[in-house]
Structure formats: C-alpha cells, structure tokens
C-alpha cells in the first residue's frame, strides 16, 4: 500500500506544480519585463554571469556570457561550459514586449537564432558543484569538483569543443581538502587568492600565483574550527583581510588573516537553529552580512553586534540554499530554497505599514517571488551589467533569465492604492 500512496502523493504534487506553472506563465506579462527559458541538455548546479558585455552594431540586443556546468548521469561526460546570451536593449524591450507562448519567453526582440547558446565545453571530472571566475581576470575559473581537489581553468587556453578522449586537463589542481564541497570565493583585493569550504570541515586558502608542482598547488593555509560540513565561504567585499564561513554546526564565523591563528575566528555566532548553507556580504554596507539556513530563514547580521540578528526573513517554506545581493542596489537581496521559489527582498521596506490584505501576501520587505521553476533551484546570479536581471538554474535542466517588471521595484509606485503583484 505504501508505494501506491507515495505514487499518488507524487502524482498530486506533480499536478499541483504543473497547475502553479500554468498560472505563473499566464501572469508573466504583468510580472516581468523579460523572461527567457532555455532547456539545457543536462542540469547545471552552478551559474554565474561574466562581467563583459558587447553591443553588436545595428542589433537591438547585447551579447553577454555566463558560466555553467553539467550534472550528468553516470556514464556521460561532464563539462565546465560557457554560454552566450542575447539580451534585449532597453529600447527594443519597450518596443517589442510580447509573450511567446510556445517558448515560454517574454520580451521577445527578433533574434534569428536562439538567445542562449553554449559556446565552449571543457572536460571536467564529475559534475561541477560550483564554478566562479576570478574578478581580476575573468578567463580564470575555479570549480568545486566531486573529488577533494579544486580545479582552475583558463578558458582562453582550451578549445571550444572538448577533446574526444574525455581527458580533463585543468590548468591547476588545488589540494588541501579530503572531500568535496560547495564553498568557493575569490578575493576582489588580492589577485589569485581563493577560498574553499568543504564537507571535511576545513577551509582552504590558496594563492594561485605560487609556483605549482606538476600543475598542483597545496593550500597556503587551512582553517579549522567548524564541527561538520563547511557549506559556504565568502570574502568580505570592503576589507581585504576578512572573510566569513558558515556550516552545518549552525555557526557563522568571521576570520581576519592578520591574526596568526587558523583555529580562532575573530567573531562567531550560532546564526540559525539548523545548518547554515550560505552567506553573502553586502557590497555597499561593510557591516551587513546575510545568511540562509535549513531552518527556512534568511538572517541579517551587523558585524559590530553579531550576537543577535538584525532581522529575520522567514517566508520560505523550505530550506534556504543560496543568498545574493543585487550588485547595484544596497537594500536588495535574493534568496532561493528547496521549494522552487526565488524571493527578492527590499530591506528598505522593513516595518513599512501594510493593509491586512497586503500582509497576507507576505511582509512589506518581500518584493517579488520568482515562480518560474518547477524543480529545486540550484544556483542564481545577478547580472552585473543589466539592472535587475537574474539568471537561475534548476534541477530539471532549466536555465531562466528574467527581470521583474519595473513597476514592482520603482519607488514612485509606492503610492497609496498601489498593489503591484509580488508574483505567484
């Protein structure tokens, strides 16, 4: 009987998800200025926009690139991938906003070819858990692998199509961990300084400018204080010696490289009631850090008074796996959870007055819910060149590139009687 009940439950859930998706699709023109949906051959666990942007002359779109990976079945090869994306110029977007029902796309703008194109595949041993580019030289990409090693690739030195022998040839192999993981962060201040957190409870720091032996580098420092998996690491964006780490032991630790101890962070707090999965330092405010947890909440901490959270965002119905600040707006934060939803928050609206009707949709700081995915979202990335454009990837192979409607985030619309929808 149990199996039948499970099957029925699964079928009901699938039907509900499909129903929700249909409603989302119908409402897309009211909620978005842009939606591009692209089915990848395999799911990607990682996505990150690259910082370059070109405007081909005489075209009504810009061309940008992003990093993706693969998570294939057992016998299929895995790749680190680069994709090229055509995004409408603002004028074109306003002239030709329409929804293409067949392709689940909104904001079409007359490109002859597909808007998303894989332009490079680099052989990779096992799935790409996470891939991030080095800020000082975006050709350099680090990847978290299914082994203990972290790989570094210079994609300008690799062919666009991978060698048929399937051999993975990273330009560097970084050693120091004993198991795989997800945490990965490049320093914006010190070129080549890379942090990594893994399931072995350790944090490794490498300087990729050091001299390798047989294309391999040992960690420059290994930090040990977490008891259990280190889920994420992040460099501070204003202070070059500071970085943060979070883990399954529920702790947020802040470290200072100027202190000699690799076992004593300068600040520590039990941040959540369950595993802490992610953290992000605010790019504008040097004191603010956000964390996300299996306890379904996102918390904000002030480094000057870290012992208690500044604020808790608790609308997610499932565990939170990723948080990320909008690179151009100090108060805008996004977070995604196991429950197929990506939420965008405007922290400047905390404690604003609400009508009881509005309160039913969520707290005032909940700006928008992206409901376009029908499977768990693995990663997302704010576009550094285009305001409010986000790329998100989910376990069902779907890559979505989207931009919420301008009237949702524009302050001039925050007038009495304004009830811009937040999304499904």
Curated annotation (Swiss-Prot):
One of the record's GO molecular function terms: histone binding
Superkingdom classification of source: Eukaryota
Xref: Pfam families: CAF1C_H4-bd, WD40
Classification via InterPro entries: G-protein_beta_WD-40_rep (IPR020472), Histone-bd_RBBP4-like_N (IPR022052), WD40/YVTN_repeat-like_dom_sf (IPR015943), WD40_repeat_CS (IPR019775), WD40_repeat_dom_sf (IPR036322), WD40_rpt (IPR001680), WD_repeat_RBAP46/RBAP48/MSI1 (IPR050459)
Protein localization: Nucleus
Keywords from the UniProt entry: Chaperone, Chromatin regulator, DNA damage, DNA repair, DNA replication, Nucleus, Repeat, WD repeat
Example GO biological process: DNA repair
Name of the molecule in the record: Histone-binding protein MSI1
Organism this protein belongs to: Solanum lycopersicum
Gene: MSI1
